């Protein structure tokens, strides 16, 4: 792959070829499109022509004709969705005629060919190449089968089958085959398959361009048709709204007037009947109430009378009984005084017994109360004792708990201290033994790896030198041929890169054109839908406002008309009521007068008939009477028949009127039904249909928005996932790199800290060892100095005694081999009591000294003032033979310990300041602690001098 890396890349770009349309839709003239049949009208015909047929075509449903082509859409229809060119490519070009192939070849050869197809496809997918080579190769195999050639014996088939077995490698053989099939065909079959592939691609491109132009024209035509349709709908809507307002208002006015009159008449009749019934009911109720109350009053009077009679009889009986009883008692009172005395004695005895019993009861009660209180006190005392015992137990328990808690806490503290000590020891061991040992082990491994790499590089260098010598021995012809091949390959690669760059430019131009076309279609759809919704919303709102205003005005007018009609009807009713009363009075008067006149006429007629009968009676006979009776009977029958005919005529007229009124009522009901209820139902149904249509459109729009949002969310989620994955990957790489750097830096810092601590502890151990050695040296010197001082003290005392005094004055000095002669005699003041204290003080003072320890025998220039005075006194008086002896200096241990620089008589390693140990390399106080340790590690004299 290293040799063919650039070739692989150029071939990959070569296989991803795209085609640019030969002519864009903006460059094609209108006349050419009309002649080719791609459009049916020119721009002038669209502007100046009528819009009726476009509206009809736009309102038709979209129906694809089965006889039309795959990409041919009828003009002025909505654009169909674009067809995936990859699927078309596979369907039109790459499908094998499997029936014919199986007819010519056996199953084994078909399986071999299909296996090779799958291997080629896997190879192209593995190296991220286009599948155009597979399509051309399939066309090539189909052409071979059609020509009667066995594809299994083909040269290129066998080469591909051999090369694609096992692992996929992009070598020069496959590159040459790709070049033959894609760029330079060597036989007519390959050229024919390549031509078929290019023809299919060009066909797809032409169909796409044709579909694009047709879609644009259909879009413009639909937009124009929609505008015209909106104008027509607006005009029709205005006409329909005017007519509906006109006819509905007239019908409503007539129906309202008729309904109001009918309601008034019916309500008046109901009111009259209601008033009459209420009057009758009130009259009957009053009568019933009066009858009931009258009966109650009568019953009460009878009851009181009965009670009065009964009470008078009872009172009389009781009075008689009481008077008789009183008389009887008075009569017996005279005879029964002894009985009265006995009764009073018994009463007195009862009183005495009662008092005695009362006193006994009081005593018993007090005794019982005292016993009760005593029991209560005993119970309370027992309860208090129990409580005190419980409290004592609680106290003991609390003390024990507190003690155990403290014991547990101290035990836990000790455990924690032990755990902390063990952890610190473990960390120290891990730091010292793991880190340092591991670092040394890694250094050794690194050294071994460097040595091995150097050996490998040496072998490689030797091999390269041998290879160079071998290539130098080759012929010049091979060298020139390789140079020629390289130059030709380089030129071919540059040409391929140029073609790929041109194809990429064409692809980007085509993609941008398709993107702009798609955006234009989407924006056109959105604008048309927005115009529709805005127009519908605008005029729907205006129509709703007008309908609400009309309804409110109709309600107000109907209310005003009803109020006026009620007032007019009440006025007419009042006038007619007055007239009816007057007419009733007149009618009654006329009836009375008419009755009087009829009575008078009948009386006069009777008188006249009687007079006529008296005049004509003698001349009339029976025959004449019978004839006259017959005539009268005929005349009366005629009159009766005539009256009956008149009554029948009146009855028929009344029946006709009733039938007419019934028919009128039925017609009126039907008219009301068709004018009012049907109109209301139609309006409600129309409103329901409008609302349903609006909701349907709104739902479709919402579904489109939701789908687009879901698609956008999916795209955004994928984009965000990819972006976050790349960010996460880079962040993870940075964290990994930083963690490696941090580990390296921490390892370096830990190594530095451990080295510092090891140096410090090694220096401390060296100091301790040196101090031990100096202490031994000091002890030897101190022993010698002590012996020397004791000898000198014994000599001075012996010389200063009066028994050993001499007359001559000599200079008494004891010379030691350690120090030189001094001008004055030196001694240690004090007595033998301070020897041990002095030795211990000097030991503790010079326990940490770093230089030579001075001798305990000091000169007068080094001793203090008291020692100087004593030495001077001894030198002046004692040695000159004075009779008085100077007192020895008194030793004060408190003063000496106070003047000492240190009171410690041994080396205490606990006084060495502790250095906090931590594994973290960011401790900023390492140098300060080291300085502090160095400062405290000095001797007391050096610290005093500072």
From Swiss-Prot:
- Whether Transmembrane helix counts among this entry's keywords is no
Q: Which domain of life is it from?
A: Eukaryota
Q: Pfam families this protein is in?
A: Sfi1 (PF08457), Sfi1_C (PF10638)
InterPro entries referenced in this protein's UniProt entry, alphabetically = Sfi1_dom, Spindle_body_associated_C_dom
Listed Basic and acidic residues bias regions: 926-940
Any single Gene Ontology cellular-component annotation: half bridge of spindle pole body
Instruction: For the region Disordered, give the residue spans.
Output: 846-901, 917-946
Its subcellular locations are: Cytoplasm, Cytoskeleton, Spindle pole
Residue(s) carrying Phosphoserine: 10, 855
* Gene3D superfamilies, sorted: 1.20.5.1760, 6.10.250.1000
Broad class of where this protein is predominantly found: cytoplasm
Please list the residue ranges that the record marks as compositionally biased, kind Polar residues.
857-883
Q: Name one GO biological process term.
A: spindle pole body duplication
State the UniProt keywords alphabetically: Cell cycle, Cell division, Cytoplasm, Cytoskeleton, Mitosis, Phosphoprotein
Q: How does it assemble?
A: Forms a complex with CDC31 and interacts with SPC110. Associates with the spindle pole body half bridge.
Q: Report the protein's function.
A: Component of the spindle pole body (SPB) half-bridge involved in the initial steps of SPB duplication.
Q: Which family does it belong to?
A: Belongs to the SFI1 family.
The identity of this protein, by name, is Protein SFI1
Q: Which gene encodes it?
A: SFI1
